[in-house]
């Protein structure tokens, strides 16, 4: 699988929430006391707001969690922290039932529960000729955290909007095995050299051998022959391709299509033209084809 490109990632920041570190206030004062706590409902890789009620909350507090990172105490409206009401934010980095530990004065002041659902992304696909619908992709950050975070950064920046599935990979016997896209803006043609791929972010480390496999309807990262070269391009396995788990160092699976598998099948059956041109080093000229009309990704959003 071949991929290229580089676009600066636009990670969402928590506007209005400033300050630094996990604590604030004066060390050595009265021990902080937490009498109540709550959180908002946060999705994976988004901002969790933690609200603490009690006394002496302007003293030094330390917040930690196995499922949230980069704790910040808020001092800016509308979340202005005080001695009796404190607000902290962090970016969720785990899924399931999790906790935040609040410590101060050498003791644990509170344990705050929160939960994060398995993240999902919805792709809107349309070729303008009857093949259209939504693909809901459930992501697996437990096994492939770097790959999932990379994919979500592209999704949140709008990078995938109006890109295409440009390559329908087929074997020498013309059996479809992958549908690859996410690197080229529409339109592309089987008779004209592809334009340059969209500029993408820096390549990421390869995450393989972590319990996920290139089975039918799974989603994986395309890359060059260099192991740590994946950027934006993805591919859907349209058949079981377990050989790709180890072939050439393996290809990183990081999710699967959990709603819309019939659409994947329709994409496989959509019109596709062999190309006489060598678009990129991932194209096998004699078997691979370009879906025409283009199978366009009209939108990509994190929906859970």
Please tell me what each predicted stretch does.
Residues 21-304:
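Cyclophilin-like peptidyl-prolyl cis-trans isomerases
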Residues 16-19:
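C-terminal motif of bacterial Sec signal peptides marking the signal peptidase cleavage site
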Residues 1-9:
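Bacterial N-terminal signal peptides that target proteins for export
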